[in-house]
Structures are given as C-alpha cells and as structure tokens.
Amino acid sequence: MQPSTNIFSLHGCPPSYLSHIPTSSPFCGQNPNPFFSFETGVNTSQFMSLISSNNSTSDEAEENHKEIINERKQKRKISNRESARRSRMRKQRQVDELWSQVMWLRDENHQLLRKLNCVLESQEKVIEENVQLKEETTELKQMISDMQLQNQSPFSCIRDDDDVV
C-alpha cells in the first residue's frame, strides 16, 4: 500500500486552505512551499531510482506476503482435510460400536425371550397343577365332611355288613 500524497504539493500549487496568503509575497514566481528549496543532497535521478527500487522492494514484499498467505491457505486446507478424515474415521468407529451393541442387545433379547417362554410354560404347568390340587382338596374336604356326617348320624352304630371288617 502506498501512502496518499497531496497532488498540489507535488506541482507547487498551494492548496485551497492557503488562499488567505497574498500572491504578492516575496515568493512570487517561486514555489511558496518553504521546504521547496530545502537541499536533500539527493538528485532527481537518484530519487527516482530510489522510488523505483522501493516499488520493486514493495512488490517483492507483496509477492512474498501473497506466497505466505497462499502457503497458509494450503496448510489450512490440508489440515482441514486431515481433520475431516479423522472426524469421519471417529464417526465410523462410533457407528461400528453402536452396531456391535445392537447385535449384542438383540442376542441378549433373544436369550431373555427364551427364558421368559420357559418360565411362562412352567407357570402354566404350576397353575394347572394348582387347579388340580384345589379340586382334589375340595373332593377330600367333601369326603371328610361326608364322613363326619356319617359319624354323627343316629344310625352310625348300625353298619352294613360290608363295612364290618
């Protein structure tokens, strides 16, 4: 970037803000800039070569700066690609682990279902046996009740001949 310069100071014309200075000054016909006659010890050709060398130096610096920026962009691009690759690999590992868990859980679920079916079958058998035992209990209670009634009847001392031992 080159600094902006006032074009009036380059051509010897006073800027508009100096319009209050009379034109009949001792500088009439000369450059009113007090630094115009300042001797630098550098002639015009040296000054121009210095400017052009500064321009080429600034052009080289700008080129170097652009190269550095491009190198950084390339490195960042490569780094981003590598980071994206690592991220994809990490996600793939997570997906693989999740699938492994799914398979393990499915197997576990099947085993639990088999056990549940066995328990349900056992429960049915126990329920059937329980019903059968209740029926037997009811029958036995009825028999006991009948026997007690027979023992309490007034004719309990008379027995059939079949009952005698």
UniProtKB/Swiss-Prot annotation:
Renumbered residue ranges of the record's region Basic motif: 72-93
Domain of life: Eukaryota
Keywords: DNA-binding, Nucleus, Transcription, Transcription regulation
Residues covered by region (Leucine-zipper): 98-112
UniProt keyword annotation of Transcription regulation present: yes
SUPFAM superfamilies assigned to the protein according to its UniProt record, in alphabetical order: Leucine zipper domain
Pfam families xrefs: bZIP_1
Residues annotated as domain bZIP: 70-133
Main location: nucleus
GO molecular function list: DNA binding; DNA-binding transcription factor activity
Compartments, record wording: Nucleus
GO cellular component: nucleus
CDD domains the UniProt entry points to: bZIP_plant_GBF1
Alphabetized Gene3D superfamilies for the sequence: 1.20.5.170
UniProt keyword annotation of Coiled coil present: no
Quaternary structure annotation from Swiss-Prot or TrEMBL: Forms heterodimers with BZIP34 and BZIP61.
Purpose: Probable transcription factor involved in somatic embryogenesis. Acts as a positive regulator of BHLH109.
Name used for this protein in its record: Basic leucine zipper 43
Species per Swiss-Prot/TrEMBL record: Arabidopsis thaliana
